[in-house]
From Swiss-Prot:
Name of the protein described by the UniProt record: Uncharacterized protein YfnD
UniProt-listed InterPro entries: Nucleotide-diphossugar_trans
Lineage: Bacteria, Bacillati, Bacillota, Bacilli, Bacillales
Organism the protein comes from: Bacillus subtilis (strain 168)
Database matches in Gene3D superfamilies: Spore Coat Polysaccharide Biosynthesis Protein SpsA, Chain A
Length: 311
């Protein structure tokens, strides 16, 4: 039995971001298998040429069923990708169930230490959620995006976990939009998990501020380094969620869609290691596929918040 079975979803526009996530997992996690759902054929075909140990690429038709196909017909591509998050996690939990723990992870995560730290906080829990821990700049977002961020959702191999993830799947099939509906309390796939602490036993809200650190909470903390590791205050950084990070060209990036990052330690210790790893994979993929440029967004379409260009 493996310790961890992880799931993620990728389209052709997120292949470049997927590579650092997988690379960092290999660097920091000892016993895992990652299942990657490719939501378009080009992503699947390209990824066949980038083999990884402990990674399985899954085609969309392998897990779609009539319920999902009906949902696919009444929403945008982006909304359908969000709908697939709990559906694919449940698919992994059902088909490859020989693991102690499971988790959905967005492709724009980057690991700085072992994700086992998250589950070690409460090894017998059934579900693991990360609070946004919003900084003052983002306090008003709680009413729109909810308490928890579903870029990472963990589950134990328990009856409660299967029931919760199945319910999450059904909720998203019924309704999953990019609009933030404050009356209905929905936003994509995200806000449905707010019900879990009241509905299910064994829900653990992750305590570590080093889990799902991101643009919406990093301003709360002091970033530092100790013994070669990145710390958030006095806590080791487990993973950073690079939401709002944009690829403009092979050498130019926008660090944050929402504001300019003023803290130099955050840029040097968190963003630059990610950028350099990302650049390595852009170069490697484009050396094999010179015409592949999916995932870049023209500069005129990106807010002028924090551009950075490599030499």
């Amino acid at each position: 039995m493996s310790t961890f079975h992880f799931s993620t979803i990728v389209s052709r526009t997120h292949i470049f971001k997927l590579m650092p996530m997988i690379h960092s997992l290999h660097e920091h996690c000892d016993d895992f298998h990652l299942y990657v759902l490719c939501v378009d054929q080009k992503a699947y075909e390209l990824l066949q040429h980038v083999p990884w140990e402990h990674v399985t690429f899954v085609q969309l038709h392998e897990m779609e069923d009539p319920e999902l196909l009906k949902a696919k017909s009444n929403r945008t591509f982006h909304e359908y990708c969000w709908t697939l998050k709990p559906a694919f996690l449940f698919h992994v939990m059902s088909k490859w169930d020989d693991a102690e723990y499971f988790a959905h992870m967005d492709t724009d995560l980057f690991f700085f230490s072992d994700p086992a730290r998250i589950f070690a906080e409460n090894p017998t829990a059934s579900l693991y959620l990360t609070d946004h821990r919003n900084s003052p700049r983002f306090m008003s977002y709680y009413d729109r995006t909810g308490r928890f961020n579903t870029g990472f959702v963990g589950a134990g191999n328990t009856k409660e976990a299967y029931e919760a993830v199945w319910q999450w799947r059904q909720d998203c099939i019924e309704f999953c939009t990019v609009e933030m509906d404050t009356e209905r309390k929905t936003y994509g796939d995200q806000r449905y998990v707010e019900k879990w602490p009241e509905q299910f036993k064994g829900v653990h809200v992750v305590k570590s501020i080093g889990a799902n650190t991101a643009l919406w909470n990093i301003e709360n903390y002091k970033v530092g380094q100790k013994d070669g590791r990145v710390y958030i205050d006095e806590t080791p950084l487990i993973f950073y969620h690079f939401s709002g990070f944009t690829l403009v060209t092979e050498k130019e990036f926008n660090l944050c869609w929402y504001y300019r990052i003023e803290d130099e330690a955050t840029i040097k210790m968190i963003y630059m290691p990610y950028i350099l790893n990302l650049k390595r994979w852009i170069d490697e993929i484009q050396s094999a596929f010179p015409d592949f440029a999916d995932g870049f967004i023209p500069k005129h379409a990106v807010p002028d918040t924090h551009f950075i260009q490599l030499d």
